[in-house]
Amino acid sequence: MIKVGIVGSTGYTGAELVRLLTRHPHVELVGLTSRSYVGEHYWRVYPHLKNYTDLQCEELDLPRLVDRADVLFTALPHGHSMDVAREVLSRGKKLVDLGADFRFRDQAVYESWYRVPHTAAELLPRAVYGLPEINREALRGADLVANPGCYPTASILGLAPLLAKGLIDPGEIVIDAKSGVSGAGRGFSLKTHFAETNENFQAYNVGVHRHTPEIEEQLGRLAGRDLTVAFTPHLVPMVRGILATIYTRPAVLPDRDELYELYADYYREEPFVRVLPPGMLPQTKAVAGTNHCDLAVVPDPRTGRVIVLSAIDNLMKGASGQAVQNLNLIFGLDETTGLVFPGLYP
């Protein structure tokens, strides 16, 4: 059994990790840390997990937790995983970080967007960006994995076939994305207060969202050149889900069937990417609670654009589900282990 500890287990991504790992056939949970619920049984914090784990939340004692675990997940705010990573790797163990601390090759990019010093910059070259669909081989056996952000996951999967084939202008990409409120985390804030969010639809962090450079770095790798995207996120009154609508400009506009075949062929062997046939469009409810990404690609002859639509569950393929997929790859398991189930509908 793979012994797993979770640092920061009582946020939404931590809870989703616990939900997935309690039913994973090759995992034993050995520690769940929390600053807010020390001594509480985990199921008292999240009652839906009663009878699935009897672990109590514990204060972080990193050396002791590392001794017990083969791998740690960190589900912490940015800036808090650096010291954890250094300790874990120095002890010969593995780390999957669900935060942003190891997603960038360039320390200066991280520091300019996240406004904190990177105190473990020597580990950045060692980190593997954890999007299996573009980085699978590098993830096998990796000891430090930077789990992607939710918006980048939806955006990169939506654009990868077009950029890999060189069919679109890399300087003409517009990403318009909508997310449910769980993406903001479990902490209380006016922005996610029921009375502020219900029956409301709002843009936020226009032009300055911290996922922008992450999207640009990974799309630039696919395109083979630096690029800039226009990215605008929106908050919508639902709990889970991201829907990204992506506008691109090709040199020559393919027809509907050509685009479908391009995407279907590119993702043919991918267990969690579903390319919808012409006439069907992604919807967040169809992926809720699953590790799937649903894609559709549509030509717009009137404007000469190719429009891509990408839907994921921000807590699953956008966070914890993808982290478990990465865990499976790290330890040489079938990457779908513990992740094959339909979502809830309606």
From Swiss-Prot:
InterPro entries listed in its UniProt record: AGPR_AS, AGPR_type-1, NAD(P)-bd_dom_sf, NAGSA_dehydrogenase, Semialdehyde_DH_NAD-bd
GO molecular function per UniProt: N-acetyl-gamma-glutamyl-phosphate reductase activity; NAD binding; NADP+ binding
Reactions it catalyzes: N-acetyl-L-glutamate 5-semialdehyde + phosphate + NADP(+) = N-acetyl-L-glutamyl 5-phosphate + NADPH + H(+)
A Pfam short name: Semialdhyde_dhC_1
Keywords from the named record: Amino-acid biosynthesis, Arginine biosynthesis, Cytoplasm, NADP, Oxidoreductase
Main location, first listed in the record: cytoplasm
Active site: 150
GO biological process, one term: L-arginine biosynthetic process
Pathway(s) this gene product operates in, as recorded in its UniProt entry: Amino-acid biosynthesis; L-arginine biosynthesis; N(2)-acetyl-L-ornithine from L-glutamate: step 3/4
Enzyme Commission number(s) from the entry: 1.2.1.38
The organism's place on the tree of life at top rank: Bacteria
SMART domains from the UniProt entry: Semialdhyde_dh (SM00859)
Keyword Secreted in record: no
UniProt subcellular location: Cytoplasm
GO CC annotation, single: cytoplasm
Function text: Catalyzes the NADPH-dependent reduction of N-acetyl-5-glutamyl phosphate to yield N-acetyl-L-glutamate 5-semialdehyde.
Family matches, as PANTHER family: N-ACETYL-GAMMA-GLUTAMYL-PHOSPHATE REDUCTASE, CHLOROPLASTIC-RELATED (PTHR32338:SF10), N-ACETYL-GAMMA-GLUTAMYL-PHOSPHATE REDUCTASE, CHLOROPLASTIC-RELATED-RELATED (PTHR32338)
Family: Belongs to the NAGSA dehydrogenase family. Type 1 subfamily.
NCBIfam families in UniProt: argC
Annotated protein name in UniProt: N-acetyl-gamma-glutamyl-phosphate reductase
Protein source organism: Desulforudis audaxviator (strain MP104C)
Lineage of producing organism: Bacteria, Bacillati, Bacillota, Clostridia, Thermoanaerobacterales
This protein's encoding gene: argC
